[in-house]
């Protein structure tokens, strides 16, 4: 009960905190307006991290990650994948929207690429940029590597790791960290085996960390799946990886 009250108070207070520390950035994909967020330390020529949010678009988990990354000395930019007027309002619409970009992966890669350009415009050092993504965004992190986007590393956090097996595996020069919960029903042993095969065939520098007693959205404090201990471990693993490849 006390934990629930404290969590509610924290989440209520973070709205004001986020609004003060993250700046809106409008950008375009043709006629489609996109609305991203960037940390306040822009223009300082620092390593950069692009954050790809979960299937409902920019949320508190992505915002928390951005503010924490700023404390670690990174410029962080949260991408808007869907665009103004297309943000899902429920699980059904989120599933359809995310499903479209998973199927049309080149469109997903393009939206990620446009967000990377905004990150660079806001001061990120071009050859010191990484991508992290949650859930649907974790899929995007892997697509960044598959698409040879100009980033040195990606972190997929409880992402969908599978891809259409009709797609050919290609070379992968991006360093890859996959953080997946052991009890994620959306990821099968076959998905793991296919990903490992893909990474090995691409001669990638990869690692997979699996978190015990954890379900799909184990890193999200708002989710019933939240596992505080494992979420902290996953975040520390993310920071360690980013420090290795960006600092």
Stretch-by-stretch model annotation:
Residues 24-122, 222:
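Serine-hydrolase catalytic machinery in alpha/beta-hydrolase-like enzymes
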Residues 178-180:
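Short beta-strand/loop motif that positions the catalytic acidic residue
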Residues 123-134:
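Alpha/beta-hydrolase fold nucleophile elbow
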Residues 183-187:
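Acidic catalytic loop of the alpha/beta-hydrolase fold
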Residues 150-160:
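A conserved short beta-strand
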Residues 37, 193, 200-247:
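C-terminal catalytic histidine-bearing segment of alpha/beta-hydrolase fold enzymes
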Residues 133-137, 141:
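Gly/Ala-rich beta-loop-alpha elbow adjacent to hydrolase catalytic centers
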Residues 65, 188-198:
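Short alpha-helix in the alpha/beta-hydrolase fold that links the catalytic acid
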């Amino acid at each position: 009960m006390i934990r629930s009250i404290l969590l509610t108070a924290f989440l209520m207070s973070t709205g004001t905190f986020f609004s003060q520390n993250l700046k809106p950035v409008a950008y375009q994909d043709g006629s489609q307006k996109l609305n991203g967020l960037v940390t306040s330390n822009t223009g300082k020529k620092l390593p950069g991290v692009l954050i790809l949010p979960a299937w409902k678009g920019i949320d508190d988990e992505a915002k928390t990650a951005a503010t924490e990354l700023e404390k670690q000395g990174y410029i962080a930019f949260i991408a808007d994948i869907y665009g103004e007027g297309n943000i899902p309002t429920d699980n059904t619409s989120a599933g359809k929207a995310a499903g479209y970009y998973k199927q049309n992966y080149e469109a997903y890669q393009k939206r990620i690429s446009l967000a990377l350009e905004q990150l660079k415009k806001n001061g990120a050092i071009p050859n010191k940029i990484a991508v992290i993504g949650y859930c649907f965004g974790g899929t995007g992190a892997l697509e960044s590597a598959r698409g040879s986007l100009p980033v040195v590393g990606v972190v997929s956090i409880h992402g969908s790791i599978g891809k259409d097996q009709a797609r050919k595996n290609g070379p992968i020069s991006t360093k890859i960290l996959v953080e997946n919960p052991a009890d994620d029903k959306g990821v099968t042993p076959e998905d793991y085996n296919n990903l490992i095969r893909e990474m090995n065939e691409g001669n990638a520098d990869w690692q997979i960390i699996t978190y015990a007693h954890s379900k799909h959205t184990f890193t999200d404090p708002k989710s019933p799946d939240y596992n505080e201990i494992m979420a902290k471990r996953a975040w520390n693993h993310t920071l360690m990886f980013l420090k290795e490849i960006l600092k």
